[in-house]
């Protein structure tokens, strides 16, 4: 598909973006045949296939200037000094990606009713911005949607506009 896109003159190319949701849910042919034959073995070739596919994809998509967004699941790696999050599917995606953002959420409550989520985005890898920075966004379930003012108090405190004293903000 990318080769066909590249054959068109640049003026005729419409903007394109690839989205893969979710990398962890992809299956290999070996995995499918093992499931059909009722074998309960783990597919050890999946991460190699993913690594090879992303090696080719990043080259082709880079030539065509096509962005790609991939979602994937994470799991906690326990055993090191500090537990860390790791992506499933091997290391191929980690090396191919220019930006890796880990998303997590917690419930936003009004009394006992859950009215939305606080979504935390942490940059684990970035070629465009500082790594290991967090951003929190509030998302309401009702018509309000994303809260555009969430986090401005903390940002003003960091900028020196006011101080947080005993849970209150003083100018």
Residue spans for each PLM region:
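Conserved inter-motif catalytic segment of the P-loop NTP-binding fold
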Residues: 1-52
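Phosphate-binding/switch region of NTP-binding enzymes
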Residues: 43-159
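Terminal-proximal interaction/regulatory segments of ATP-powered molecular machines
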Residues: 164-171
